Amino acid sequence: MSFPQLGYPQYLSAAGPGAYGGERPGVLAAAAAAAAAASSGRPGTAELGAGAGAAAVTSVLGMYAAAGPYAGAPNYSAFLPYAADLSLFSQMGSQYELKDNPGVHPATFAAHTTPAYYPYGQFQYGDPGRPKNATRESTSTLKAWLNEHRKNPYPTKGEKIMLAIITKMTLTQVSTWFANARRRLKKENKVTWGARSKDQEDGALFGSDTEGDPEKAEDDEEIDLESIDIDQIDERDGDQSNEDEEDKAEAPRARVAPPASARDQSSPLSAAETLKSQDSPLGLVKEVSEPGSTRLLSPGAAAVGLQGAPHSKPKIWSLAETATSPDGAPKASPPPPSSHASAHGPPSGSPLQHPAFLPSHGLYTCHIGKFSNWTNGAFLAQGSLLNMRSFLGVSAPHAAPHGPHLTAPPPPQPPVQVATGVLHGEKASARSSPALPERDLVTRPDSPPQQLKSPFQPVRDNSLAPQEGTPRILAALPSA
């Protein structure tokens, strides 16, 4: 087999069909005919050999079809000069001479010299949208800024933008670099600067100039959060957050405690008595049973007794006020119910209202057996403090001095009688609420408006009207 077009007539297939293993008999026959024609020199056989050679070249080198026109030309199947062959078939030289052939690509190819190495399109490495790696030249600017601001290495937003433009880095890269630089400074300063307090280690290590300006401090904190590198988060952040939660949990307890102490200091009692009531919740109940005691009621309970149920509210601020409140004392010593009616007054274990604590108009509250009616709202709409007749019997022995108290100040003698009656009534327990109508049946006369003379008679008539029906209904029950 020979390629006379390429100037290699000496490259013959001497081995015959063994060179290709009998796979291409047509190609080998055409090559043998071309070689015979070239050796004989006859024109007929030369043309036949040229056609056979063109067929052989086309079949073997089909991708280089440009060799076809030259195969049919006369005398081209003979020996060709080597230089002329290179000038004619220079476009094929790239397969054999990769280094020495400058004319591999014709001028019609407008391809980039290395188009496969730029995945970002037409921009090479100057694409403004592509992040730039931090080099030593770019970080030198950041190091210079850090050395100038070593006391407060927290750049503002504008300074970060300026440094990002100068160093051709992104804002996130600048923030991350400063975060890492601050961590390196902390590690160095722990060794060289000595021990620091925990607050300074957590955030104020460098003595920031923004200690007196809270707005700028918040700005620095926000920027510091933006520049945190997620891969290198300090473990002290979790400890600091736990301490903040503990401080927030202690703050509500500190705010709840002062109101009770402020009210205790403003009370008429002394501070020693207040502390005594806080130490022993049952102390006031024990003092009531003593004959010569004058501290019969705490200021909180006296205020509730004078103002009435509409102005009372639950005491949740202090243990002392909860223990000395009217609804707290009966729970400490609940009075047992009795079968007979007692006209002497409240039991000994209930907090009483001493006459010394009463104002000039001298209104007395009911004993503790009927206090549940006040709290349940049975007499709220009837002016219960002015209508004492429904709570105190008219013909009761201790109710006689109470008539003048509605219009004139009380004389000193009736309060002493009330106190002695209370002290003598220690043995008698409090009456239960079902026994209330029974005493009213015994002591109430048939015509109460004619019995009691007072300028408040119309008010009492209106208030007593619904109450007078209750004994009559209950009186009819035993007869039925």
From Swiss-Prot:
SMART domains, alphabetized: HOX, IRO
Subcellular compartments: Nucleus
Organs and tissues of expression: Expressed in specific and overlapping patterns with Irx1 and Irx2 in the developing and adult metanephric kidney. In the adult metanephros, renal expression is found in the loop of Henle in the S3 proximal tubule segment and in the thick ascending limb (TAL) of the distal tubule.
GO CC annotation: nucleoplasm
Molecular function GO labels: DNA-binding transcription repressor activity, RNA polymerase II-specific; sequence-specific double-stranded DNA binding
The keyword NADP belongs to this UniProt entry's keyword annotation: no
Keywords assigned: DNA-binding, Homeobox, Nucleus, Phosphoprotein
BP-aspect Gene Ontology terms: metanephros development; positive regulation of gene expression; proximal/distal pattern formation involved in metanephric nephron development; specification of loop of Henle identity
Top-level taxonomic group: Eukaryota
Composition skew (Acidic residues), residue ranges: 210-232
Residue spans binding DNA: 127-189
Composition skew (Polar residues), residue ranges: 264-280
Biased composition (Low complexity): 254-263, 339-351
Main localization, broad class: nucleus
Region (Disordered) location: 190-285, 318-354, 401-480
Keyword Phosphoprotein: yes
Record-stated family: Belongs to the TALE/IRO homeobox family.
Record's protein name: Iroquois-class homeodomain protein IRX-1
Naturally occurring in which organism (per UniProt): Mus musculus
Biological classification of the source: Eukaryota, Metazoa, Chordata, Craniata, Vertebrata
